[in-house]
Amino acid sequence: MSKLKNFDKKNFHSFFQKDILICISIIFLIFFFDRVSKIKIIDHQLKNNQIYINDFINFDLVWNTGIGFGLLSFETSLLYNIITIIIGCVIIFLIYLITKSRFIDKILFSTVVGGALGNFYDRLAYFAVPDFIDMHYKSFHWFTFNIADIFISIGILTLIVKDLFIKNEKN
């Protein structure tokens, strides 16, 4: 008897819907925590200055008109708008990949989309992304970033490491 005859369409749709529900939840939670953190830091910054935590990390609001970690900041609105459109297209493509990928990749793409949507929202609402996590050690100073950047980085780096590891396993 063929395994194809035992295929249960109802269970397939149920599993697929659970996958998508998990991905939507991840995207929403990351977007939510990113928004809340940015709203809190913007509100605090209007009343006070930076938040000193320790010698390694502070919260200090910086408005980023570029892409990740303040790279490629633009003065002209044309370049800013082009980058924003490209980011929107990348988000749409990542959502497509979520629907076509294996479960672990769906989760990782969802972390990237959740963070990207947080920053995309800011680009549309404020014409800049509020970055506020300021890390430094002695004279070394890292780029200022936000919660969305953390999830984008974790998702992308984990996808890269996973793909390298799996390719090495196959070879």
Regions found by a protein language model. Give the residues of each.
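Alpha-helical transmembrane bundles and membrane-interface segments of multipass inner-membrane proteins
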Residues: M1-N171
